[in-house]
């Protein structure tokens, strides 16, 4: 069953609605402003239900949301060197919003700043959201139609399906930017997360947090999560990559990528105090692991104060700066070649 209610009004004057999807041992709240995940309620071992998603109580706080809590990011997630992408011999320019580089397309006018059109699918317990960009809008070519479909399945799996169609060649790499704390969104560092990542390689970054182009083995580094290990020690490791980002803000190269055709488990997360667990699946080649290294919001939901490390984001996407790295899996889409990315969240308690 899907319920909807008025959540407020966007700066453009368009009404914003909040939608609730329920399933076995899960309740998901989303809104059409930014196709944003607002909250996910799941139980711990004794059955105590908590919201495990960081965010705000009020719509107005999402208008100034530099952390991009819960947002659908696009058309290009993550960082692009020089804020420029070359497509078919033409240079296309996005805003230089992080020094000379681009982060998340356009932090002021990106997809997370729009009110999306909505279609409810009661049969599949899904909310389908759609928005469009004209040719050249946000600095990239193509008349583009973007979709984000949010589904809670009969087995309690939360699925997000991203898609894009364009009438000319363009570059697309969408993701969802939800932050989690499996001990509860306001638990802060009073938690103990352990990770497993199906990733034998990661992408080192330079002093501007742009991938160097190397696809490096994780063995012997803080990025080796091939076996269950706590994330907190790695966030403060004496490692130049960790120091550069103040924690983890790196792309893990998920094993078994087959050009978006295979959904596979990328990450497994356990919170030891509550017994909540998360299996994270995707069809994307990489997952940006971000450990909230720059969080610091005093206006969060339930009067929470999210500081450094208060939550982690798993961002399934094309590798950062792919247009400048020919050895990376590429993300050019166009007529007859639509973009798609599937993300699934499987919550458990053990």
Where are the regions that the model predicts?
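An exposed, glycine/acidic-rich loop-and-rim segment of catalytic or binding clefts
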Residues: 1-350
């Amino acid at each position: 069953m899907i319920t909807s209610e008025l959540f407020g009004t966007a700066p453009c004057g368009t009404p914003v609605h909040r939608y609730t999807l329920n399933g076995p041992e899960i309740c998901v709240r989303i809104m059409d402003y930014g196709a944003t995940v607002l909250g996910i309620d799941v139980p711990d071992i004794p059955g105590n239900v908590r919201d495990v998603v960081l965010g705000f109580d009020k719509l107005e706080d999402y208008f100034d949301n530099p952390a991009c809590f819960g947002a659908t990011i696009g058309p290009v997630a993550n960082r692009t060197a020089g804020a420029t992408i070359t497509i078919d011999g033409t240079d296309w320019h996005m805003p230089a919003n992080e020094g000379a580089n681009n982060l998340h397309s356009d932090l002021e006018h990106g997809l997370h700043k729009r009110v999306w059109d909505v279609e409810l699918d009661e049969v599949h317990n899904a909310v389908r959201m759609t928005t469009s960009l004209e040719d050249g809008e946000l600095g990239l070519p193509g008349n583009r139609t973007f979709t984000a479909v949010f589904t809670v399945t009969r087995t309690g799996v939360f699925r997000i399906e991203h898609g894009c169609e364009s009438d000319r060649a363009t570059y697309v790499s969408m993701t969802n930017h939800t932050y989690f704390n499996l001990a509860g969104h306001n638990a802060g560092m009073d938690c103990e997360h352990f990770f497993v990542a199906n990733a034998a390689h990661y992408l080192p970054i330079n002093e501007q947090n742009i991938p160097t182009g190397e696809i490096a083995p994780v063995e012997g580094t803080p990025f080796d999560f091939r076996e269950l290990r706590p994330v907190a020690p790695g966030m403060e490791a004496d490692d130049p990559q960790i120091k550069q980002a103040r924690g983890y803000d790196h792309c893990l190269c998920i094993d078994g990528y087959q050009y978006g055709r295979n959904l596979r488990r990328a990450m497994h997360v356990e919170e030891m105090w509550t017994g909540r667990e998360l299996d994270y699946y995707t069809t994307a080649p990489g997952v940006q692991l971000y450990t909230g290294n720059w969080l610091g919001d005093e206006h969060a939901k339930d009067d929470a104060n999210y500081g450094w490390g208060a939550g982690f984001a798993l961002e399934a996407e094309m590798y950062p700066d792919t247009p400048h790295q020919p050895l990376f899996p590429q993300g050019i889409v166009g007529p007859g070649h639509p973009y798609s990315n599937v993300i699934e969240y499987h919550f458990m308690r053990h």
